[in-house]
Amino acid sequence: MSLVPMVVEQTSRGERSYDIFSRLLKERIIMLSGEVNDDSSNLIVSQLLFLESEDPDKDISIYINSPGGSITAGMAIYDTMQYIKPDVSTICVGMAASMGAFLLSSGANGKRYALPNAEIMIHQPLGGFQGQATDIQIHANRILKIKESLNKILSENTNQPLEVIEADVERDNFMTADEAKTYGLVDKVITKNETGKDK
């Protein structure tokens, strides 16, 4: 069981309490922590759409501490980040691996950050299926198509040639924050909050 802290604020009408995530959302901050799955994806997509409706011209920040997870759930977040009008800045705290790293690299140009001790890992899609040989072949072909699509987007996000991405994701590829910056997964390694509310 995880505990969610409550934040109490004084207003002209008395005290008001929020859970910490609702209070952060009020500041246009979204947390992606833990596995990327349908539940976390639905929450993040909903928050992105809500914040766009609140103010389409103000940046949104997503803090990422995730080992990755479902590709389809992650692509729902990615597509929504590209679809909405506000710039979405991404900040890695702890670890961004697999789909977490993909989403980190997909933040707005110049607004992708990592804290100094963050770790980033990229690799190719994982999948497993059992059944008839033809069904296995169908699923294997699907994974290869997904791999090709993810590699193309990662190449665009990092400005790395596609052949470099294809070689580098063959196995788990771990990077420090500085290495991720050099590679093009993030734009800056930050020690103080530089994301800014109006940048």
Curated annotation (Swiss-Prot):
It is found in: Cytoplasm. It catalyses: Hydrolysis of proteins to small peptides in the presence of ATP and magnesium. alpha-casein is the usual test substrate. In the absence of ATP, only oligopeptides shorter than five residues are hydrolyzed (such as succinyl-Leu-Tyr-|-NHMec, and Leu-Tyr-Leu-|-Tyr-Trp, in which cleavage of the -Tyr-|-Leu- and -Tyr-|-Trp bonds also occurs). The active site is at 98 (nucleophile), 123. Its EC number is 3.4.21.92. The keyword Cell cycle does not apply. GO terms for cellular component: cytoplasm; endopeptidase Clp complex. It comes from the Bacteria. Gene3D superfamilies: 2-enoyl-CoA Hydratase, Chain A, domain 1. One of its GO terms (biological process) is protein quality control for misfolded or incompletely synthesized proteins. Belongs to the peptidase S14 family. Cleaves peptides in various proteins in a process that requires ATP hydrolysis. Has a chymotrypsin-like activity. Plays a major role in the degradation of misfolded proteins. Fourteen ClpP subunits assemble into 2 heptameric rings which stack back to back to give a disk-like structure with a central cavity, resembling the structure of eukaryotic proteasomes. PANTHER family: ATP-DEPENDENT CLP PROTEASE PROTEOLYTIC SUBUNIT. This is ATP-dependent Clp protease proteolytic subunit. It comes from Clostridium botulinum (strain Eklund 17B / Type B). The gene is clpP.
